[in-house]
Structure formats: structure tokens, C-alpha cells
Amino acid sequence: MPGKEVVILGSGDIGLIMARRMTLEGAKVKVVAELMPYSGGLKRNIVQCLDDFGIPLKLSHTVVDIDGRDRVKGVTLAQVDENRKPIPGTEEYIPCDTLLLSCGLIPENELSTGMGVTLNPVTGGPIVNESLETNLPGVFACGNVLHVHDLVDYVSEEAARAGEKAAAYVRRVHAGNAPGAVTDAAGAASAEEKMIPLKGENGVRYTVPAFLRPAYMDEQQTVRFRVGAVYRNASVAVYLDEKQIMKRKRPVLAPGEMEQIVLKRSDIPEDVSRITIRIE
């Protein structure tokens, strides 16, 4: 154990789980501070890791000073404004001997970038189509290298799908019928085959996949996405160009919880130029 009195900065799932683990190991977790006005973790982890142990969560707060030379003696928290800047006069000193930083995950893609895979600036992972194929033909991505997941169940599903589609690609290569690249270097659709951009708007930060090729879609296509803020009593709407084909009510949408919808291949006509997912 690095210490006995702990302050945690960051309320994603790892930070929340570490708060519980350090408490169970005998430490006193004094507070979990979060820069954003919402937690980045699953609701159940907030309840099971913080609420059940009486650990306070301070939203819209960050560490502005660390006291100590040879080791930490305390930290100063401050509330932040809508621009994430500390608000003068809101400082609070908290004695502690350990500061645990849990400030976000990004996919590790050194191998991908070295190969020339195009990355999504929002997720930090590759841009993929419905088969989880990148802009490099025959190169597929799944799991946390693609985008950070909440649940290992989703990682397992993506891994199975990527393996299935990679095997199908190899069979097409041997048959002399391999498709062209998913996207060009700029992320644009290849002219060799029909590709439909899939985009998020009005609160949807990104979608996986980012492109759909009707010729290679299964009848049911899972699309995963995250929102950029907390929404209550909102709806997830799907548009083909400007025509709405789906609307699903959600009591709560939060950045810390990955969302998903299922599109049907039979609902997508050949003349569609784009698909959009919006929060309404």
C-alpha cells in the first residue's frame, strides 16, 4: 500500500474501483474529485464503490496544489467553472499521504499508427466499417484498441465479430474477390464500393462503426456510441439522410455508459447518402 489517507482524482470506472479496493485494503479514501460535472463511470460502480463505503464524490472539482516534498502531505481542491478553470475562493485543503490519478484512458495504437491506420480523433482508436475493418484492407480492430469499453462482454462480442469478418476477408482474397480499402487516407469513402458514412450529432460524440457498406452488412448491425453530456428523459433518433427511421426513449444518457442501437440492413435503401444518430 502506498499510503493510508488517499485522495483520488478522476471518477472513471478505474478510479471508482480503486477507491473501493484501497478502502478494503485498509486505507481511508477521503474524497474522489472529478473535473467534469458528471462521473465518467458506470452508475452501479458509483453506488457499489463510493456510496456503499461512504466515500464522497466532488464533481466539477480538481487538484490545484500538492503539498509535500519527500512525500505527499496534502492536496488542495478547487471547484471549476464551465470552462474547467478553478474558481478563486473555492479552495479546500485535504490532508493525505497519497494522491491517486485516474484521469482517463485512451486506446494504445502505436502499432496501428506505425502501419498507417487512420485514427478517430475522438476515440483515439481506428476508424472502422461495419466489419471492424480499418482503412488498411485486411486489418481489423476491436476491443479497447478501437474505443474504451465499459464491459468485457462488449469486448468479447467485438473480438468474435472481428475474427469472423477477418476470416471472411481471407476467403474472399483466396477467391479473388477482396474488397478495396475501407477509407482513403483522409477517411473518405472508397469509390470502389458503396459506403455510407455513419455520424453522431446533437450530443453523440462518435459512433463505431463510422461507415457501413450495405453489401457486407449482416441483417442486424450493432452500432455503439457515447454521448458528450448527461441527458434525462431524452431520445436516441436515427436518420437516413433527413428521414427518421428509429426513435428510442432513454430515461438517462451519460458519458460514462456506452450506448448501442441495432440497425436492420433491410431498413437501409440503396440511395441513402448518410446515416445520423442524434439525441433529441
What residues fall within each predicted segment?
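A conserved FAD-binding loop/helix module that cradles the flavin
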Residues: 142-176, 180, 188-200
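A Rossmann-like FAD-binding core segment of flavoenzymes
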Residues: 16, 21-110, 219-251
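FAD-site-proximal beta/loop scaffold in flavoenzymes
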Residues: 97-149
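Surface beta-strand/loop "capping" patches
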Residues: 175-231
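Phosphate-coordination loops involved in phosphoryl transfer and adenosine-cofactor binding
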Residues: 2-5, 60, 69, 136
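Aromatic sugar-binding surface patches on proteins
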Residues: 255-262
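Glycine-rich dinucleotide-binding loop and its adjacent helix/turn
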Residues: 1-15, 122-130
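Short, aromatic- and glycine-rich surface loops/edge beta-strands on solvent-exposed regions
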Residues: 223, 236-238, 263-280
